Amino acid sequence: MGNECVLVTGSGGLIGSEVCLHFYRAGYSVLGLDNNQRAVFFGPEGDTSWSLRRLRRDIPGYEHSETDIRDREGVLRLVESARPKVIVHTAAQPSHDRAAQIPFDDFDTNAVGTLNLLEAARRWAPESPFIHMSTNKVYGDRPNKLAMVEQETRWDYANPEYRRGIAESFAIDQSLHSLFGASKVAADVMVQEYGRYFGMPTCALRGGCLTGPNHSGVELHGFLSYLVRCNVTGREYKVFGYKGKQVRDNIHSEDVARFMLAFVQKPRCGEVYNLGGGKENSCSILEAFALAAEASGREQVWTYLEENRIGDHICYYSDLTKMKTHYPGWGISKSLKQTIAEIAASWSSRPVSTA
């Protein structure tokens, strides 16, 4: 690989594959790392081998490694050999529901795997920007302690202090995270520490709902993609608590990749950013049902379960002020309505089961 190599972990996933394509178009050679653990975690519905085939088709010279990020020596060898100019770390065990069933796998993947990559970068690529895809789950259920106002189709923050959403200064400890959230906190803090302690150009992106037409959404992960998938295929969607009024902000994978490239062009050490669609691209589940029906022409089939998921947010959307201040050339380019239309078109053209 050349000096302009970008190493992308989780390259078969939604964000990883988008980053591979975006950086290739920006002139980088691409080394992807992915052993299709989504198929292990979620079964055939989570399989991303189709995405890898797409990368090999669309990126001339694409190179791929199936190294497991839990394999410390394998990761060290890979980074030593490649000496990437940029490292984008999107690989993860992404489900907070499943983490409780596989706690060792979850922590080894999310926390230890991130440490393996950070140490490999410190040894062999210390000046290369290191971008870690974190999660808003690092805030645990603390956002639920904020005063809320119930509206017709959604919950929202009652305090005008949060009119733009949750900022990076919001506390991340002394709350219920789920085991997934806790393992991601460990990774998030370690990414910051390598940046601040060793002076490395690192950032952790605390993602809201990351989505797009290439997302292999399943019930345990990928809220908007899975919701639209259910709409398109006529599958029943289960709503867990909060009257279906729980709110998420949604960001298209292209806008995620655009921000990552902006960071690479002007890196900082040990930064964190809340990366989401902001209030303008937020929706409740009930509102998402209406948008999906508008995009597909089909009514949503759904059922309601009173018990909410452990640690689930009642309302969460990202305050994008810090991101836009540090990187004023970046902004949301894909509206929620446009994103849902793209997801609906994608699921309509993919061979999927209605079971």
Kindly label every feature range from the protein language model.
Residues 242, 272-273, 286-289, 297-315:
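C-terminal "lid/loop" region of Rossmann-like NAD(P)-dependent oxidoreductases
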Residues 256, 260, 275, 288, ...:
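Non-catalytic, hydrophobic alpha-helical segments
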Residues 253, 272, 309-331:
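Conserved C-terminal active-site "lid" loop/helix of NAD(P)H-dependent oxidoreductases
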Residues 1-208, 346-347:
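N-terminal Rossmann-like NAD(P)+-binding domain of SDR-like oxidoreductases, especially those catalyzing
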Residues 2-5, 28, 321, 334-355:
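Amphipathic terminal alpha-helices
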Residues 52-60, 154-170, 228-240, 266, ...:
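A short C-terminal helix-loop "cap" of Rossmann-like NAD(P)-dependent dehydrogenase/epimerase domains
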Residues 74, 116-119, 250, 255-258, ...:
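Conserved mid-core alpha-helix of short-chain dehydrogenase/reductase
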Residues 185, 198-201, 211-226, 235, ...:
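Glycine/proline-rich active-site loop of Rossmann-fold NAD(P)-dependent oxidoreductases
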